[in-house]
């Protein structure tokens, strides 16, 4: 099976490596010629996964046409805010009925659309068959062959079963479900809560506060998801609770790192510029906040993070406001 992977960041590279190791014909589309050279010559992504050996069968290219030629599956791992532009530019090269799998986690800020909705918008008339893969999965650990479990959401149960097999290895276990919206929203909202968890840890608020943020963050994720048509049970799975716990506690989490650096007094622009990789939660906070306003859903942690990130509020003041909100049943 030929698979075109769009996006040569850490996660796109990790998934391309995983699939190449299974014997799939994988082409990784990357815009940076230095990354292409590193993957093809040195079997390493020098920018995002330096020091980790990639499968020698994996080939990278800057030529989108070369990557997409004859592809059975398009695996999109470009940052969420760039997805619409990339899909629009590649549409003339895509065939009708193509399988499109997203591994990006976020919500578009301009249109408040998930990746699946952007695929519907931009590939209308091509009848794409869509799926999303998400879950607790640091790229470096996947490349290192450490045990990982994720979930693949696909409305077509048969296609979901087929893709579940494609994306599974002895160290990478893929479950499937039909709740595409739930899988997408879990992967997006957890990034907002992860920034809050990093901020809390950086301010020295302790383990109790982190556990409270994770638990109440899960409640926010579920409330918004159900309001948008997802199943509440999905958020208790790998794309919800699983990814939330990992991203709020693991030091490889970019969004947690944003929170930690905010606690040190660094400015948001400097943090984002200095990371070298996309932390989806910064933009997603804005999108989730706007969605909550539109749907009339109460998301106090998200509202607090929006105030910190986009209104310049003092994090300690926002913690005080969260802790002194009107008391209620859980």
UniProtKB/Swiss-Prot annotation:
Protein's organism: Nitratidesulfovibrio vulgaris (strain ATCC 29579 / DSM 644 / CCUG 34227 / NCIMB 8303 / VKM B-1760 / Hildenborough) (Desulfovibrio vulgaris)
Keyword annotations: Cytoplasm, Lipid biosynthesis, Lipid metabolism, NAD, NADP, Nucleotide-binding, Oxidoreductase, Phospholipid biosynthesis, Phospholipid metabolism
Gene field: gpsA
Signal peptide location: none
NCBIfam families from the UniProt entry: PRK00094.1-2 (NF000940), PRK00094.1-4 (NF000942)
Database matches in Pfam families: NAD_Gly3P_dh_C (PF07479), NAD_Gly3P_dh_N (PF01210)
Main location group: cytoplasm
Recorded catalytic activity of this chain's protein: sn-glycerol 3-phosphate + NAD(+) = dihydroxyacetone phosphate + NADH + H(+); sn-glycerol 3-phosphate + NADP(+) = dihydroxyacetone phosphate + NADPH + H(+)
InterPro entries documented for this protein: 6-PGluconate_DH-like_C_sf, 6PGD_dom2, G3P_DH_NAD-dep, G3P_DH_NAD-dep_C, G3P_DH_NAD-dep_N, NAD(P)-bd_dom_sf
Family: Belongs to the NAD-dependent glycerol-3-phosphate dehydrogenase family.
E.C. number: 1.1.1.94
Any Gene Ontology biological process: carbohydrate metabolic process
Family matches, as SUPFAM superfamilies: 6-phosphogluconate dehydrogenase C-terminal domain-like, NAD(P)-binding Rossmann-fold domains
GO molecular function terms listed in the Swiss-Prot or TrEMBL record: glycerol-3-phosphate dehydrogenase [NAD(P)+] activity; NAD binding
Any one GO CC term of the record: cytosol
Superkingdom of origin organism: Bacteria
Location(s), subcellular: Cytoplasm
Lipid biosynthesis listed as a keyword: yes
Entry protein name: Glycerol-3-phosphate dehydrogenase [NAD(P)+]
Binding of NADPH, residues: 10-11, 31, 105, 139, 254, 278, 280
Active site (UniProt): 190
Function in brief: Catalyzes the reduction of the glycolytic intermediate dihydroxyacetone phosphate (DHAP) to sn-glycerol 3-phosphate (G3P), the key precursor for phospholipid synthesis.
